[in-house]
Regions:
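Rossmann-fold NAD(P)-dependent oxidoreductase module
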Residues: 21, 113, 117, 170
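A conserved beta-strand/loop element that lines the FAD pocket in flavoprotein oxidoreductases
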Residues: 119-131
Length: 210
């Protein structure tokens, strides 16, 4: 690898956006992700996903890398929460002043756009590369790939590999690291609400429904 080579673990939203920032600085960037390339996987095989909401901080980051105008067409403004009670009634609670909104966006489509932008800028994305261990003493990262294990010696490693981070687990084994993990008691249910006969949203698209 080059002397300015950066290795990012995780090709999710954070990892791919970080790659875009670094490529714009002229650095050599490699992203490794344990999952297959979602662009080659039909949506129904890709697992469930909750739409995410973009607020001011998210838009500011996208603006800094020149992606705001590309992402905006994928997003729907939400001006508040719509609370549904057990009797079928609803109450609308605005997020702020008139026209102040956060934006709902498909996590999958957003992630795909960021990965493609990172690749367009010259980052290399290695899918199906599961990080098994990071050896800080020997500056070595071990990956499991479809063809077997490989070991690399990157100059810099950035962890963006989520809740069960392999990088964090490796750090815990080798240095004194405190962290806290909490689980909430709530469950998760995915509902599909088809459009009306006229092809319109069956529920107000400009609100977060609770």
């Amino acid at each position: 690898m080059k002397n300015n080579s950066i290795t990012i673990l995780g090709a999710g939203l954070i990892g791919s956006l970080m790659a875009i920032y670094l490529k714009r600085q002229g650095l050599d960037v490699h992203i490794y992700d344990k999952r297959p390339d979602k662009r080659k996987t039909p949506y129904y095989e890709g697992g469930r996903s909750i739409n995410m909401a973009l607020s001011h901080r998210g838009w500011k980051s996208l603006e800094q890398v020149g992606l705001k105008d590309k992402v905006l067409p994928l997003a729907i403004p939400m001006y508040g929460r719509k609370i549904h009670d057990e009797h079928g009634g609803t109450t609308f609670i605005p997020y702020g002043k008139a026209n102040q909104a956060i934006y709902s966006i498909s996590r999958g489509k957003f992630n795909q756009l960021l990965v493609e932008e990172a690749e367009h800028l010259g980052a290399t994305v290695h899918f199906e590369h599961k990080c098994l261990d990071v050896d800080f003493q020997d500056n070595e990262v071990t990956f499991e790939t479809p063809t077997g294990e490989i070991r690399l010696n990157p100059n810099v490693v950035i962890g963006a590999d989520g809740a069960y981070s392999a990088l964090r687990m490796s750090m815990q084994k080798q240095v004194r690291v405190n962290y806290k993990q909490e689980f909430i008691p709530h469950g998760y249910k995915e509902l599909t609400i088809p459009a009306t006969a006229a092809g319109e949203f069956a529920m107000d698209p400009h609100a977060l429904h609770i």
